Amino acid sequence: MAVITMKSLLEAGVHFGHQVKRLDPRMKRFIFSERNEIHILDLQKTLQGIKDSYELVQSVIKNGKKVLFVGTKKQASEIIEQEAKRSEMPYVNNRWLGGMLSNFNTIKKSVQKLKKLEKMEVDGTFEMISKKEVSQINREKLKLAKNLTGIKDMEELPGAIFIIDPKREQIVINEARKLGIPIIAVVDTNCNPDVIDCPIPGNDDAIRSVALFTKIISDAILESDKEVGIQIVENLNEEDLMSEIEVKNERKES
């Protein structure tokens, strides 16, 4: 069983929002306080978002569907790939190609082409064609692989999508909403939580925070067949929480 503590969230810098001037007013309900012109997120609501997301993910997996991991920003890209691979889920961590969901059949054709080119590399085809042709095929293969490798084994639309930085991934959200695919996302103070089915208030810039949230989703997938849930430990009261919160230069404004 996964155990999440408020202290672990604090240590990962989950509570740090953006500068006050960058607030999306729709995030006000998730704000705990303000320190040095930086918004502090309400970790009680973060814990609730984690719990709701954990339950949704496990429901999706038990119904035989997959969760698509999406995070293309620098801080998230490598983590998204690692955790998606760990839980054997599809992922997009370089660039979202318009239509990856809404025009899925066309995307599948591109994936099939990628698989065909990869097969040519190992079945002896390269030995029967010119070096120039091999070079052209390799260039095309690399171009396709850059954006499609993570979804090569996604045979159907996902049952849910997990997103780091929904403000950046607006095209993903638009496509998912049109198709009725549930969205789980880490929402920072500059995001719109109203377009997310399971918003998790949190810092989407700090690597430790991104890693923590992504690991939680991956753990939920891996534990879905064990009939176990998540244990939330609120091991800090409000007074302790306030004393722990010291806004430092732990996030880079972008």
From Swiss-Prot:
CDD domains: RPS2. One of its GO terms (molecular function) is structural constituent of ribosome. PROSITE patterns: RIBOSOMAL_S2_1, RIBOSOMAL_S2_2. GO terms for biological process: translation. Transmembrane segments: none annotated. The keyword Ribonucleoprotein applies. Keywords: Ribonucleoprotein, Ribosomal protein. Coiled coil: none annotated. Belongs to the universal ribosomal protein uS2 family. HAMAP family: Ribosomal_uS2_B (MF_00291_B). This is Small ribosomal subunit protein uS2. The gene is rpsB.
